[in-house]
């Protein structure tokens, strides 16, 4: 191996971006097969390949950053910029859903009965499960901040406690959202209201599941002593992502559940 005279990380060739892209193709194709032909095979294959790719890719990053020392200050700076740009791209992703919702609701067409919610739709009560979900996510935002401060202060026990609480709240939110979908009187095929509601809240729910997966990974890494008070970007990125999920939910709650009902 040649001697490196700079602080940048020259990443070795990796198969995981390719297998990750293939799993994304299988997931989207699997969703189409599920929606149109009620077949789960391709979707389950996509989920399996996605989980394997994520695990292997995470393992490589942990090895490079924690054991091989490739994540220098300047590399961490680049990772921070990358995470910030990723979250900005996610903001615009959700902006499209809000645009679709407000475009449909601010000037309802005669086909919808000229009113919002459309004729025949019974919207969910914003003061029941949606309000509980809001309080759960806000509480999880507090607990993830507690975990971050505990980590920076070197308080390992409190960090593990706070992170476990955050994960439990994330799982509770997901369970309540699934129950709400199951009991809703309308479906994704009930016109523009059903499609905008389920696509916007469904993608947010997917982001909560992804964020919870990030936090579970951080919990495992913390139990293995991977993080220190000044070297923990993996956890920091997961915390940023969780706060983003919190903020998006507040906009969803105010727009779709409260104002939209």
UniProtKB/Swiss-Prot annotation:
It catalyses: 4 Fe(II)-[cytochrome c] + O2 + 8 H(+)(in) = 4 Fe(III)-[cytochrome c] + 2 H2O + 4 H(+)(out). It comes from the Eukaryota. Component of the cytochrome c oxidase (complex IV, CIV), a multisubunit enzyme composed of 14 subunits. The complex is composed of a catalytic core of 3 subunits MT-CO1, MT-CO2 and MT-CO3, encoded in the mitochondrial DNA, and 11 supernumerary subunits COX4I, COX5A, COX5B, COX6A, COX6B, COX6C, COX7A, COX7B, COX7C, COX8 and NDUFA4, which are encoded in the nuclear genome. PANTHER family: CYTOCHROME C OXIDASE SUBUNIT 3 (PTHR11403:SF7), CYTOCHROME C OXIDASE SUBUNIT III (PTHR11403). Belongs to the cytochrome c oxidase subunit 3 family. Keywords: Membrane, Mitochondrion, Mitochondrion inner membrane, Translocase, Transmembrane, Transmembrane helix. One of its GO terms (cellular component) is mitochondrion. The lineage of its organism: Eukaryota, Metazoa, Chordata, Craniata, Vertebrata. The keyword Mitochondrion applies. It is found in: Mitochondrion inner membrane. It is a multi-pass membrane protein. Pfam families: COX3. GO terms for molecular function: cytochrome-c oxidase activity. Residues 35-40, 106-128, 184-190, 257-261 are mitochondrial intermembrane. Its EC number is 7.1.1.9. This is Cytochrome c oxidase subunit 3. Residues 1-15, 67-72, 153-155, 224-232 are mitochondrial matrix.
């Amino acid at each position: 191996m040649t001697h490196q005279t700079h602080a940048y990380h020259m990443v070795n060739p990796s198969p995981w971006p390719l297998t990750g892209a293939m799993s994304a193709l299988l997931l989207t194709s699997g969703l189409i097969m599920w929606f149109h032909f009620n077949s789960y095979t391709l979707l389950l294959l996509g989920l399996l390949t996605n989980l394997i790719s994520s695990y292997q890719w995470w393992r490589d990053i942990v090895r490079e950053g924690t054991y091989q020392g490739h994540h220098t200050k300047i590399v961490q700076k680049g990772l921070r910029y990358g995470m910030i740009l990723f979250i900005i791209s996610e903001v615009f992703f959700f902006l499209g859903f809000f645009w679709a919702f407000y475009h449909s609701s601010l000037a309802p067409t005669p086909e919808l009965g000229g009113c919002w919610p459309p004729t025949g739709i019974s919207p969910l009560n914003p003061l029941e499960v949606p309000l509980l979900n809001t309080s759960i996510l806000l509480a999880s935002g507090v607990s993830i901040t507690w975990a971050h401060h505990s980590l920076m202060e070197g308080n390992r026990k409190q960090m593990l406690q706070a992170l476990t609480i955050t994960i439990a709240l994330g799982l509770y939110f997901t369970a309540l959202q699934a129950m709400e979908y199951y009991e809703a009187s309308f479906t994704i095929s009930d016109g523009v209201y059903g499609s905008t509601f389920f696509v916007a809240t469904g993608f947010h729910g997917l982001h909560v599941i992804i964020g919870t997966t990030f936090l579970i990974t951080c919990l495992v890494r913390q139990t293995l002593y991977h993080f220190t008070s000044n070297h923990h970007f993996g956890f920091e990125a997961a915390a940023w992502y969780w706060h983003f999920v919190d903020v998006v939910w507040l906009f969803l709650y105010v727009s779709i559940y409260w104002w939209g009902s």
